[in-house]
């Protein structure tokens, strides 16, 4: 992939500095690049560095707007600490011919390492033996398809039915972005055009709970549809499977999960059912343990998939995923938490805090106006997150009763730590 050493990023830094507000933090990036453009923007950067104006670039949470006028969706980036945890949430426009059918998808990073990945593109850039170094056919049959991303696929078809012209007409709508508090940062957006008749509303929050070792990510995908559909909700994790709290069967031989729209490239390695209303799936990646805790229904199917089917030239990575399949469903909520915890040392060969701190995750309220999710830890302490689903202002007051208890707040959401 690209880095800030590429010529295009040298151009971007110099132009942004010269024509922007001359942010001195950009100068530190230019110093690392050790290269400037031979024009007035590059000269301005060089003079700024010469005069000692450079400052360290601070990576902070930011909402980047898409489109010529900044009104075609965007990308929300939530960060905790010094890149301790970084969430990249996409609610942008199609992205011209490079665009993927990946509305409301996201990637998650831990100190720069991928935790939940976006596959990216199917191309070995400038490696002649691989399709001349150009885009491979799998870029269209896999990488662009919705099922290749951490987002919702309906009825095994991609967003906009995989049609570029249709996708180019629409973009997702930001509900709100709030990174004003370090311990609770939230981004929320809606998509109403990817599947006609279906509304997807995804809210992602980066939260630091006092009883937990690390910050965690709360993911609420609210789906509204008058029709009965099959929903597939994958998590493309990076690492080695450690544990899960459900039983599954592995087939004697691997067969593709489907025939088209990317499904033809996925092998089904395991299939099971939830053993409880809270399903957990853990893995180890880059020396850190991660647990996905998700609220499941008894009828859900839990799938373990592996990329690589219908790939005789080995153009695709053999990446794995955990997938929730929910059939014959209209309105529903997928509520999940991704929790980093503990570590494993290959030097001492010791593991620490390898178990999740979460005992239960539950959708305790859901209607058109509000969705509430509770997180209960193993000590019985309960945290509560309530989302106002309708577009509202920071000043709007809300009142809701859940289980006989009343909650009042102002703004887009309510959150209370245990």
Regions found by a protein language model. Give the residues of each.
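Active-site-adjacent bridging/hinge elements
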Residues: 82-87, 197, 303-316
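Ser/Thr/Asn(+Pro)-rich, low-complexity disordered segments
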Residues: 1-5, 16, 67-70, 100-116, ...
């Amino acid at each position: 992939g690209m880095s800030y050493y590429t010529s295009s990023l040298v151009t971007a830094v110099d132009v942004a500095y010269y024509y922007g507000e001359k942010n001195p933090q950009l100068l530190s990036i230019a110093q690392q690049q050790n290269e400037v453009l031979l024009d007035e923007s590059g000269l301005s950067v060089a003079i700024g560095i010469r005069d000692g104006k450079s400052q360290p670039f601070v990576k902070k949470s930011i909402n980047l707007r898409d489109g010529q006028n900044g009104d075609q969706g965007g990308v929300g980036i939530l960060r905790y600490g010094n890149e301790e945890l970084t969430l990249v949430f996409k609610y942008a426009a199609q992205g011209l011919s490079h665009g993927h059918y990946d509305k409301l998808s996201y990637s998650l990073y831990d100190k720069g390492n991928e935790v939940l990945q976006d596959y990216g593109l199917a191309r070995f850039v400038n490696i002649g033996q691989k399709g001349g170094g150009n885009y491979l056919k799998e870029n269209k049959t896999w990488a662009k398809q919705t099922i290749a991303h951490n987002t919702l696929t309906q009825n095994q078809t991609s967003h906009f039915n995989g049609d570029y012209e249709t996708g180019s007409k629409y973009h997702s709508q930001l509900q709100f972005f709030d990174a004003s508090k370090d311990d609770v940062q939230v981004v929320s957006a809606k998509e109403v055009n990817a599947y006609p008749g279906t509304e997807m509303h995804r809210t992602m929050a980066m939260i630091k709970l006092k009883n937990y070792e690390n910050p965690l990510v709360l993911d609420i995908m609210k789906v509204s549809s008058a029709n009965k559909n099959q929903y597939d909700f994958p998590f493309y994790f990076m690492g080695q499977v450690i544990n899960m709290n459900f039983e599954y069967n592995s087939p004697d031989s691997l067969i593709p999960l489907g025939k088209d729209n990317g499904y033809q490239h996925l092998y089904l390695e395991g299939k099971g059912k939830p053993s409880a209303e809270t399903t957990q799936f853990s893995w180890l990646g880059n020396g850190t343990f991660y647990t996905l805790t998700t609220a499941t229904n008894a009828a859900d199917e839990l799938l373990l998939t592996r990329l690589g089917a219908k790939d005789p030239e080995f153009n695709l990575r053999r990446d794995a995923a955990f997938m929730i399949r929910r059939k014959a469903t209209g309105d529903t909520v997928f509520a999940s938490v991704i929790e980093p915890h503990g570590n494993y040392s290959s030097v001492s060969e010791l593991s620490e805090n390898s178990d999740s701190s979460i005992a239960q995750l539950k959708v305790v309220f859901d209607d058109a106006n509000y969705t509430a999710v509770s997180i209960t830890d193993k000590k019985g302490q309960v945290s509560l997150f309530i989302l106002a689903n309708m577009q509202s202002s920071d000043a709007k007051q809300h009142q809701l009763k859940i289980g006989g208890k009343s909650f009042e707040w102002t703004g887009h959401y309510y959150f209370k730590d245990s």
